[in-house]
Amino acid sequence: MKYSIKYIVFTIILFGLLNLNTNVFNKNASVVKTNDISYVKDIWNPLISDSVNEKKIILVVDGLEVDVDKQDMFMDENLNIMISYKKLKQNFDCAVNLYDNDRLVFEKYNTKIELEINSNTAYINNAEIELDSEPFICDSEIYVPLELVAREFDYDYQWDIAANKISALNNSLDNPIVPYSYDLRDVARNSKVKNQGSFGTCWAFASLTAIESSLLPEEELELAPDHMSLQNSFSSSQNDGGEYTMAAAYLTSWQGPVYEKDDPYGDGVSNPNLTAVKHVQEVQILPEKNYEKIKEAVYKYGGVQSSLYLSLTSPTSKSVYYNRKNYAYCYKGEERPNHDIVIIGWDDNYPKENFNMVLEQNGAFICQNSWGESFGDDGVFYVSYYDVNIGIHNVVYSLIEDTNNYDNIYQSDLCGWVGQLGYGRESVYFANAYTANTKEEVSAAGFYATGENTDYEMYYISNFENIESLGVNNRKLIKKGKFENAGFYTVKFDTPKLVAEGEKFAIMIYINTPNSVHPAAIEYHAEESTKNVDLSDGEGYISNRGKKWDSVEETQSCNLCLKVYTKNVP
């Protein structure tokens, strides 16, 4: 193993301190001999941690390098790796929740870790342990000891000082992530039950209920379905209904959400000048009827927006498919979904006898409706795993940030993912050109994966002039990776790109979506609701193999779903 000169010097110092009696002078100039290990640590540990923190620490989980910024992870003076708690949810497949701004709870299957900010006492399944390094807050970020979480969740944990790398390998890949039953109501992660009244706005209520749940328990917000259903870019009324793609378009375009108090529901009035109070940067679309993925999403992110065919027309109406006594619903006919709800939990052992029909096995999702508290169990009911529609369309809002994350958004697809474009194959290149409004840093780009396991490469082109600027020699690779689920994703630049006022630049994406023939998401005039699509605000190009390019506005009458996020530079 090759060590740096620093580590050789440190080793010599440590050897001298540990094996020789060290002479130190007291205030009377007499010699004092000591082998105090704490004295050695006071000298040695800061030297090691400073050297480690000079470089970025690499984190590899199950063989894959994790996208972690340098400020998200560091070594403290106890030689423990501390990591932002926000990086653990996705990378260690666990539930992570912050209560009262000072208590963190990590959960995975049958393991529960409880930490308190600035306390060296922790609890593992209610058993008390002592920590070498306590969780703490720095620059509004909470850091926790990585090794504790990894080992308690049964990962092998290895630190390679020469490579500045941590490797964590899951020993329990065959074990489930989630327990047999889970209810967001039990952990203060369900939002307030609302009432959509007589309007066809269940899609907006479900979307915002899911977002409110995702923000809990850290933040308790009440968001406005009125604004989402009236101030989006679609040509439809509150009586026309909607779907999750409309909600995603409104949210990822930063048209909202806004507070309910600023746009009260049901009065037919909505202020067009309100601005978003949160920025939704990621929307995952979960695989059809994949109940384990749905459960994991509820566990990790909060409520999951889903759809079913509801034969009921009001809280007091009757249906052969609904057992009012047990709040239990199951539909097994051929009707398509007509109503959106939010999955807030599940119970694998919920009795099949509670439903109005003979079912093969137990099990149900716990769902929150938007018909007020007079429906079901204070607005909540059970939907059998055997319902034909539940779990087909599933959306989770997995990255919701404060509005200071970026200063500007450049976009031309306010209606979002309306259709798809491609060349009859799984891969495609597409690019959008933009002109900077002022001196800015290009910090991230956002686009859709239209199917599961989509590989992507993202390129930056400076000083864009025309199609020729998209040539191979002008592209700079920014990042590449894979999206497990379909959905909208924001990809950050490791190093932002500076642009001057009036400078033109472009973002190019290469994607490969298995089993797709049209992998690029586009906005176009598909039906009456998208008749107001504006083709004059975008400059997009598409290519089969990244060599010959066509304008999508001119040849396909559409806009590419590709956004750019920037920060202002003083």
Language-model features and meaning:
Residues 510-570:
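Short, surface-exposed beta-strand/loop patches at domain edges
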Residues 171-443, 448-481, 513, 518-527:
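Catalytic-core signature of thiol
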Residues 1-6:
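Positively charged n-region of N-terminal signal peptides that target proteins for export
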Residues 445, 503-509:
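Short beta-strand segments enriched for Tyr within beta-sheet-rich domains
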Residues 293-298, 489-503:
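Short, surface-exposed tryptophan/glycine-enriched loops
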Residues 9-14, 18:
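Hydrophobic helical h-region of N-terminal Sec-dependent signal peptides
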Residues 17-180:
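Primary recognition of N-terminal secretory signal peptides and signal-anchoring hydrophobic helices
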Residues 480-487, 499:
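Short proline/glycine- and polar residue-rich coil/turn motifs
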